[in-house]
UniProtKB/Swiss-Prot annotation:
<keyword id="KW-0809">Transit peptide</keyword>
<feature type="binding site">
    <location>
        <position position="177"/>
    </location>
    <ligand>
        <name>Mg(2+) 2</name>
    </ligand>
</feature>
<feature type="binding site">
    <location>
        <position position="308"/>
    </location>
    <ligand>
        <name>AMP</name>
    </ligand>
</feature>
<keyword id="KW-0479">Metal-binding</keyword>
<dbReference type="GO" id="GO:0005739">
    <property type="term" value="C:mitochondrion"/>
</dbReference>
<feature type="binding site">
    <location>
        <position position="174"/>
    </location>
    <ligand>
        <name>Mg(2+) 2</name>
    </ligand>
</feature>
<feature type="active site" description="Proton acceptor">
    <location>
        <position position="91"/>
    </location>
</feature>
<feature type="binding site">
    <location>
        <position position="176"/>
    </location>
    <ligand>
        <name>Mg(2+) 1</name>
    </ligand>
</feature>
<feature type="binding site">
    <location>
        <position position="174"/>
    </location>
    <ligand>
        <name>Mg(2+) 1</name>
    </ligand>
</feature>
<dbReference type="GO" id="GO:0008441">
    <property type="term" value="F:3'(2'),5'-bisphosphate nucleotidase activity"/>
</dbReference>
<feature type="binding site">
    <location>
        <position position="308"/>
    </location>
    <ligand>
        <name>adenosine 3',5'-bisphosphate</name>
    </ligand>
</feature>
<dbReference type="InterPro" id="IPR051090">
    <property type="entry name" value="Inositol_monoP_superfamily"/>
</dbReference>
<feature type="binding site">
    <location>
        <position position="334"/>
    </location>
    <ligand>
        <name>adenosine 3',5'-bisphosphate</name>
    </ligand>
</feature>
<dbReference type="GO" id="GO:0046872">
    <property type="term" value="F:metal ion binding"/>
</dbReference>
<keyword id="KW-0496">Mitochondrion</keyword>
<feature type="binding site">
    <location>
        <position position="305"/>
    </location>
    <ligand>
        <name>AMP</name>
    </ligand>
</feature>
<dbReference type="GO" id="GO:0009507">
    <property type="term" value="C:chloroplast"/>
</dbReference>
Length: 397
């Protein structure tokens, strides 16, 4: 294992400065959370599942905030997994916490998630993870044992469930998408993402982004985004420093941009604009004030994929382009919740050939997706233009 430098620099989306709450612990203040929905329950077939998902993601975001503070104050270990991606006790704590919350009301629905308990055990992180989970779990869970928490983590692991090539209902969780952003600091984004899939259709999703720019006047920072099939996409502030849920749900939509040179683009931080097919048509600039005729605006948005989906679904960005690399796999949890949030906000998500993302291609595990060429996430209005440009540029790629 390697210890990562928590001071490593990564590019971040340029928002107004985020309010930094005082170091007052948010522990135990989660109890007042109420998963009220912004639409009538009878309109949402999966409203019970959605209410639980909202509450679980909100609790998970509180765990992230506390762990992040303790990481930098106590210099706890940050280890690397075999693929050289960083992982912290927050990743495992979130997975355990969400798994426990979901299993209380929906024990028969399997969970597909990123982590398993191997790294917790191997790096002596068990007691730290258990402590964080106990502090955020539902009332009555303060007697959780180490075995309970480790089992909850492994419930989402690779070997927990086999789908036998049949349509299924299951949760998809990314405990922290953008761990590098979690480690970087206040400007970088990271997301807790949870979706429910029923017979290969994503029917609901909840994303929590603790670093999303908030309102300094009330001490709030972060956002929750929910989507339910047929009910739209909605956002709400996370709890503020006093533990109150700030504000009401607000429905959000993709932007209305119809001109490619006026669009705002996001790309994966590990990829360059020059590696993407649209670079043959437009140059890219990160400076909005002086764009030339053949330039598009590129928004430096770190870290992970889900924050880019959040940008498009909320109308802050027009397009997110991801190129599939032959040497790397694309994980379902990096996209599932983002797909429904963008769809319900009026946008569109396909592979580079215009086909919808198929979550069942990995028939036995549902952990991988195989989008042809890559993923296009757009406001819908620009989608066909982008696909045409990709198609015309493909012989030269």
């Amino acid at each position: 294992m390697y210890i990562l430098d928590t001071g490593a620099r990564f590019s971040a989306v340029r928002f107004s400065p985020v309010f930094n709450p005082p170091p007052t612990s948010l522990r135990r203040r989660y109890f007042i959370v109420r998963a009220n929905l912004p639409f009538p329950k009878h309109q949402a077939k999966y409203h019970k599942e959605l209410e639980v998902a909202i509450d679980a993601v909100d609790r998970a975001c509180r765990l992230c905030v506390d762990v992040k503070r303790s990481l930098f104050s106590s210099k706890e270990k940050i280890v690397e997994k075999n693929d050289q991606t960083p992982v912290t006790i927050a990743d495992f704590g979130v997975q355990a916490l969400v798994s426990l919350e979901l299993s209380k009301l929906f024990p028969s629905i399997p969970l597909v998630a990123e982590e398993d308990s191997h790294f917790v055990r191997a790096n002596n992180l068990v007691s730290s993870v258990v402590s964080e989970v106990k502090s955020k779990a539902s009332i009555g869970d303060n007697h959780l044992s180490d075995a309970d928490v480790l089992e909850a983590i492994d419930r989402g692991g690779k070997d927990a469930y086999t789908f036998c090539n049949k349509p299924a209902t299951y949760w998809v969780l990314d405990p922290i998408d953008g761990t590098r952003g979690f480690l970087k600091g206040d400007e970088a984004l990271y997301v807790v993402g949870l979706a429910l899939v029923v017979d290969n259709e994503i029917v609901l999703g909840v994303m929590g982004c603790p670093n999303w720019p908030g309102d300094s006047s009330d001490g709030s920072t972060g956002t929750l985004m929910l989507s339910h099939i047929g009910c739209g996409t909605w956002t709400k502030k996370l709890q503020n420093v006093s533990g109150n849920v700030a504000g009401d749900w607000i429905r959000c939509f993709v932007d209305a941009c119809v001109l490619m040179n006026k669009a705002r683009f996001c790309i994966q931080e590990s990829q360059t604009w020059e590696s993407l097919p649209l670079s043959g048509f437009f140059d890219a600039s990160t400076v909005s004030e002086d764009l030339k005729h053949k330039e598009i605006l590129l928004l430096p948005t770190c870290c992970g994929s889900l924050c880019k989906y959040l940008m498009v679904a909320s109308g802050r960005a027009s397009v997110f382009l991801l190129r599939a690399k032959t040497q790397r796999t694309i994980k379902s949890w990096d996209h599932a919740v983002g797909i429904i949030c963008v769809h319900e906000a009026g946008g569109k998500v396909t592979d580079w050939e215009g086909d919808e993302i198929n979550l069942e291609e990995d028939q036995s595990e549902r952990r991988l997706i195989f989008p042809a060429g890559g993923v296009v996430v757009s406001n819908g209005s620009l989608h066909n233009q982008i696909l045409e440009m990709i198609s015309s540029a493909s012989p030269t790629l």
